[in-house]
Amino acid sequence: MVPAELFARVEFPDHKILAQTKDFHDSLTKPPGSLGKLEQIGCFISACQGQIPPRPLNNSKIVVFAGDHGVATKGVSAYPSSVSLQMAENITNGGAAINVIARTTGTSVRLIDTSLDHEAWGDERVSRSCGSIDVEDAMTQEQVERALEIGKRIADQEVDAGADILIPGDLGIGNTTTAAALVGTFTLAEPVVVVGRGTGIDDEAWKLKVSAIRDAMFRVRDLRQDPIAIARKISSPDLAAMAAFIAQAAVRRTPVLLDGVVVTAAALLANKLAPGARRWFIAGHRSTEPAHSVALDALALDPILEFGMYLGEGSGAATALPMVKIAVDLMNDMSTFSSAGVDGPLNASSEAPEQNTE
């Protein structure tokens, strides 16, 4: 399988609409550019939808991809792998941070268990955990193809159900190690540059994490032009499914609000699977994980928030969602200078007042 067999060509947001949005924003009752990034976000959503003003975002959806990671047995996390399944149940029961944020922002949460370490099977399952990426492949070829198919299918389901913006989230002990390995591989960054503290590891665990990431990156050193092979060897079922979900959202012309390092690592993979997918991304926030800034730079994304968050689950992106909605609502609900009877700015070509030089 090659990416072109799985994903259709990504079309870019409407550049003509994007060019027209500046004039539209400048007609609103405010000095040009005075709403800063809110103007940029609103213009982006207009281009994604192909209309000015954009439709209000009334059907956002958070999809959390959950899976365990074999590399977690190497001492790279402060928590045991059993926490993954326990937290998945917490999300299902509505008690996690992402549930609270989702309720506050009027967003629904869907949990996808691709590879948590328990006996279960279903349409969204790939495996029970996955290989330890420092010494073995994360998945077989059959498993990676299944993970990609699952992620693509879920994106289609959500878009077909009317989602107007998608927020992927992550859950799984050890997933920041996998994410850092992917970021290092795609950006050519050194392991020590992309390794953070994850769940709060000490110095010894940090060294183990660096070692695991170094070994994983070495295993794919000759495969940088083969994203599916990279996914098979050093990602995981949950990250591969998430990458396919993000890629297919772009194919379906649906903006994706990115969360932290794990989601953004999957977004790097998505942009390899479906070139140009990054044109449909908004960075919700910047996490404290070093690899996240490296990945954001590689995707040329400027995050909305910098709150020092690093939880995952889609929490940072979901927290930024109200800013995106506000950006859209401003374009819909603000008066223009003409409709409000407010004088606009002086014509730029008008003669400037004389300066008093005395």
Swiss-Prot record:
- Is this entry keyworded Hydrolase? no
- According to its UniProt record, which residues of this chain constitute the active site? E313 (proton acceptor)
Pathway listed for it is: Nucleoside biosynthesis; alpha-ribazole biosynthesis; alpha-ribazole from 5,6-dimethylbenzimidazole: step 1/2
| Gene3D superfamilies linked | 1.10.1610.10, 3.40.50.10210
Gene Ontology molecular-function annotations: nicotinate-nucleotide-dimethylbenzimidazole phosphoribosyltransferase activity
Asked if the Swiss-Prot or TrEMBL record annotates the protein with the keyword Signal, the reply is: no
State the UniProt keywords alphabetically: Cobalamin biosynthesis, Glycosyltransferase, Transferase
Q: What is its EC number?
A: 2.4.2.21
Q: Which reaction does it catalyse?
A: 5,6-dimethylbenzimidazole + nicotinate beta-D-ribonucleotide = alpha-ribazole 5'-phosphate + nicotinate + H(+)
Question: What Gene Ontology terms for biological process does this UniProt record contain?
Answer: cobalamin biosynthetic process
InterPro entries on file: Nict_dMeBzImd_PRibTrfase, Nict_dMeBzImd_PRibTrfase_bact, Nict_dMeBzImd_PRibTrfase_N, Nict_dMeBzImd_PRibTrfase_sf
Q: What does this protein do?
A: Catalyzes the synthesis of alpha-ribazole-5'-phosphate from nicotinate mononucleotide (NAMN) and 5,6-dimethylbenzimidazole (DMB).
Similarity annotation: Belongs to the CobT family.
Q: What is this protein called?
A: Nicotinate-nucleotide--dimethylbenzimidazole phosphoribosyltransferase
State the encoding gene: cobT
